[in-house]
Regions:
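Alpha-helix capping/helix-boundary segments
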Residues: 9, 41, 82, 101, ...
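General small-molecule cofactor/ligand-binding pocket signal
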Residues: 36, 76, 128-130
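Short, well-structured N-terminal submotif of metal-dependent ribonuclease cores
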Residues: 1-38, 51-66, 108, 117, ...
Length: 134
């Protein structure tokens, strides 16, 4: 499978947070799966860090790439194909970061890993969203 991590899932994974459901952790750590973190998540993390809403042990420009490499997570760039999904996406969720992550999952046939109930409203046959947190 090709997995796209929602921002909170990436943060839970790298911090060892117990909110990360076991089935998600197992899927992410399964070496048969390709795991991606979107540049959109980088952007979200940097914005929240700058606003003082997300403490990190190092500045995000150092911390995120190190954690991504240590956890064998590939970077997913934002491309035109993904952005052009946006006009076709129902307005079920107001968060622009989540909306663009959903577009990337749809555009690239990725399994989107999240526990965000608002994102789950977008569930379709093109990608799967795992269930609830512990």
């Amino acid at each position: 499978m090709k997995l796209l991590l929602d921002t909170h899932i990436f943060l839970w994974l790298i911090s060892g947070d117990e909110h990360l459901p076991l089935e998600m952790r197992d899927a992410i750590l399964n070496l048969d799966n390709a795991v991606y973190l979107s540049v959109v998540s980088y952007w979200e993390i940097v914005v929240k860090y700058q606003l003082g809403k997300l403490p990190l042990p190092q500045p995000p420009e150092l911390f995120i790439p190190i954690q991504r490499v240590q956890h064998q997570i590939e970077l997913l760039v934002l491309d035109e194909v993904s952005v052009l999904q946006l006009p076709h996406l129902p307005s079920l969720h107001r968060d622009p970061f989540d909306r663009m992550l959903i577009c990337q999952a749809l555009a690239h046939d990725l399994v989107f890993i999240t526990v965000d109930s608002q994102v789950m409203a977008y569930q379709s046959d093109k990608f799967i969203i795992f269930g609830n947190s512990n």
